[in-house]
C-alpha cells in the first residue's frame, strides 16, 4: 500500500504540472483527493492491514495528501498568473489607434446672448452687478416710484411670499440698491432671472431673464442714452441696425420711451419676423425719474441719469429666429445644437 501511495503522488504531481488552466487543476483535485478519488480508494484497503501497519500507512497517506494539495496550490498560482497575462495581452490597447471622439457640449442660446451683452456693455465702461431674486416690495416697487395702485403689484402679476416679500418682477431693483450704496458716477448693468405670474405660452414664461442698465452722473442727457443704445444694437444685431424711440410711460423714468430696432431679418424692408413693418420692439428706456434719485439719496438738481431694460429671452428669440420661448427652457440638445 505504501508503494501505491507513492506512485499515486508521483502520478498526481505529473498531471498537475502539465495543467494549463484552473479548470484542469480542479478536475485533478477531484480525481485524486475527492470523496470518490484515487486516494480514497486506496485508503479503503487499510482494513486489511495489521494494527501495527495502520498508523504508519495513515501517516504516509496524510503526507501524500499534503504534498498533492501543495502541488495544486503552487500550480494554481502559476496558472492564474499565466491566465491573467494572457487576458491582459488580449486586452492591450493599441495606442496608435485614433481615440473615440468626445462630443463637446454647446452654450445655450440664452447663455450666448448674456455673454454677448456683458461683453458689449463692459466694452463701454459698464460694471456688471447682481441683486437678489427674492426681493422686498420697497425695492421692486416703492423705491422705483411705482404707485400703490399700479397693476404690476397685483397678485395676478407678482408672486408674493408675504405682503413685503416677493420674487422680483424685474432687474430694476438693482438700480435702487446700487444708488443707495454708491455715489455718482455710476455705470452698471445687471443680468438675471425675473418672475411674473404669467401662463406659459409661445411668448410668455413665469420665469424669464432681463438686463438692466443704469448711468448716473452730472450732465447725463437723452442723447447719451440714444448713443449707448445705438452702440448696443449695432454690436448685438449687426452694424447696419438702426433704432428709433417711441414715447411711452414708465413710473421710474421721465421722459420714457420704447425703443425699436430695424428688423435683423429683413433689414427694415418688412417680413414675417417684424410683421411687415420693418421694426421690432427691443427695450424700454428713459431718464431716471427725479423721485427715484431722491429715494436713493441722490440730488436730482445736481445729477441726472438714464436707465434701460431688456428681456434677454426676447432678444435671444429675435436674434436667432426662435418663435416659441418655451424652447429655451426644455433642455433639448437637438434644439441647442442648432446655435
Curated annotation (Swiss-Prot):
Q: Which reaction does it catalyse?
A: tRNA(Phe) + L-phenylalanine + ATP = L-phenylalanyl-tRNA(Phe) + AMP + diphosphate + H(+)
* UniProt cross-references to PROSITE patterns, sorted A to Z: AA_TRNA_LIGASE_II
Q: Which SUPFAM superfamilies does this one have?
A: Class II aaRS and biotin synthetases (SSF55681), tRNA-binding arm (SSF46589)
The protein here is known as: Phenylalanine--tRNA ligase alpha subunit
The protein's matches in Pfam families, at most eight in alphabetical order, are given as: Phe_tRNA-synt_N, tRNA-synt_2d
Q: Which PANTHER family match?
A: PHENYLALANINE--TRNA LIGASE, MITOCHONDRIAL, PHENYLALANYL-TRNA SYNTHETASE
Query: Required co-factor?
Result: Mg(2+)
- What does the UniProt cofactor note say? Binds 2 magnesium ions per tetramer.
Annotated family? Belongs to the class-II aminoacyl-tRNA synthetase family. Phe-tRNA synthetase alpha subunit type 1 subfamily.
Cell compartment(s), UniProt: Cytoplasm
Write the record's keywords in alphabetical order, separated by commas.
Aminoacyl-tRNA synthetase, ATP-binding, Cytoplasm, Ligase, Magnesium, Metal-binding, Nucleotide-binding, Protein biosynthesis
Stated EC number for the protein is: 6.1.1.20
Q: Which GO terms describe its biological process?
A: phenylalanyl-tRNA aminoacylation
Q: Which organism is it from?
A: Alkaliphilus oremlandii (strain OhILAs)
| Primary localization class, coarse | cytoplasm
Q: List the disulfide bonds.
A: none
**What are the GO cellular component annotations?**
cytoplasm
Q: Which gene encodes it?
A: pheS
The residues that the entry says bind Mg(2+) are: 254
Q: How does the record describe its quaternary structure?
A: Tetramer of two alpha and two beta subunits.
| Gene Ontology MF, one | magnesium ion binding
The lineage's top-level taxon is Bacteria
Amino acid at each position: 500500500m505504501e508503494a501505491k501511495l507513492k506512485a499515486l503522488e508521483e502520478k498526481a504531481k505529473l498531471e498537475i504540472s502539465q495543467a494549463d488552466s484552473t479548470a484542469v487543476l480542479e478536475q485533478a483535485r477531484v480525481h485524486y483527493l475527492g470523496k470518490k478519488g484515487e486516494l480514497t480508494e486506496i485508503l479503503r484497503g487499510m482494513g486489511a492491514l495489521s494494527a501495527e501497519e495502520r498508523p504508519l500507512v495513515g501517516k504516509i497517506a496524510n503526507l501524500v495528501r499534503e504534498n498533492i494539495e501543495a502541488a495544486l496550490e503552487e500550480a494554481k498560482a502559476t496558472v492564474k498568473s499565466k491566465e491573467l497575462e494572457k487576458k491582459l495581452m488580449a486586452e492591450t490597447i493599441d495606442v496608435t489607434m485614433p481615440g473615440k471622439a468626445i462630443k463637446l457640449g454647446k452654450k445655450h442660446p440664452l447663455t450666448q446672448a448674456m455673454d454677448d451683452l456683458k461683453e458689449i456693455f463692459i466694452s463701454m465702461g459698464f460694471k456688471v452687478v447682481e441683486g437678489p431674486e427674492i426681493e422686498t416690495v420697497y425695492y421692486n416697487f416703492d423705491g422705483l416710484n411705482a404707485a400703490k395702485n399700479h397693476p404690476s403689484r397685483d397678485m395676478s402679476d407678482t408672486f408674493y411670499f408675504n405682503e413685503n416679500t416677493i420674487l422680483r418682477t424685474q432687474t430694476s431693483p438693482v438700480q435702487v440698491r446700487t444708488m443707495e450704496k454708491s455715489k455718482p458716477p455710476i455705470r452698471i448693468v445687471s443680468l438675471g432671472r425675473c418672475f411674473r405670474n404669467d401662463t406659459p405660452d409661445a411668448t410668455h414664461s413665469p420665469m424669464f431673464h432681463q438686463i438692466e442698465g443704469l448711468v448716473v452722473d452730472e450732465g447725463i442727457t437723452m442723447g447719451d442714452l440714444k448713443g449707448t443704445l445705438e452702440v448696443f444694437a449695432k454690436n448685438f444685431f449687426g452694424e447696419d441696425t438702426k433704432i428709433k424711440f417711441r414715447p411711452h410711460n414708465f413710473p421710474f423714468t421721465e421722459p420714457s420711451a420704447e425703443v425699436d430696432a430695424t428688423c435683423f431679418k429683413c433689414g427694415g424692408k418688412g417680413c414675417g419676423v417684424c410683421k411687415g413693418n420693418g421694426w421690432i420692439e427691443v427695450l424700454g428706456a428713459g431718464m431716471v425719474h427725479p423721485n427715484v434719485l431722491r429715494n436713493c439719496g441722490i440730488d436730482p438738481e445736481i445729477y441726472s441719469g438714464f436707465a434701460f431694460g431688456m428681456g434677454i429671452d426676447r432678444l435671444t428669440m429675435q436674434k436667432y429666429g426662435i418663435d416659441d420661448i418655451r424652447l429655451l427652457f426644455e433642455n433639448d440638445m437637438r434644439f441647442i445644437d442648432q446655435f
